[in-house]
């Protein structure tokens, strides 16, 4: 579950708030609101998603195992012990060429960054992912949370999640996912641009 404190930035008495929760292990949410308008989303663990927690060791090449059952196509990692933002790996950074050499930040509109200080220039595998020795991602005093995503099908072979990319143009672009998505997150990787989110609840 999740508890909101009384700080204005997190729980304003008469404000509207949106919450997206990937509760991969339990699958429940207890939420109390007082005169507020609140939207909440939860994903019980299934195909294409995994949550990993780990403690850093300040050693470049530190490997972290996961249980995704596939090669992660996107990863978000957050140092829970500091104010560092979320660092993002995506299989299509740099046009899909050596994407492990690049990263994005969820808390930033900046373009992709070429730097081995995050993923140690090492691609993730179906068993784990590799980190540099930077404090943002692998401090010996830091405790971290990693969200891992991969394209996946249900038991009948129907697609249920998709991690991908597309090239923009000056005209309308149709992006085919193979199913009707209910949650879409977009970020321009090659240049400055805000993260854009669409979901079926708000239209």
For every predicted segment, state its role.
Residues 1-203:
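Surface-exposed molecular-recognition determinants
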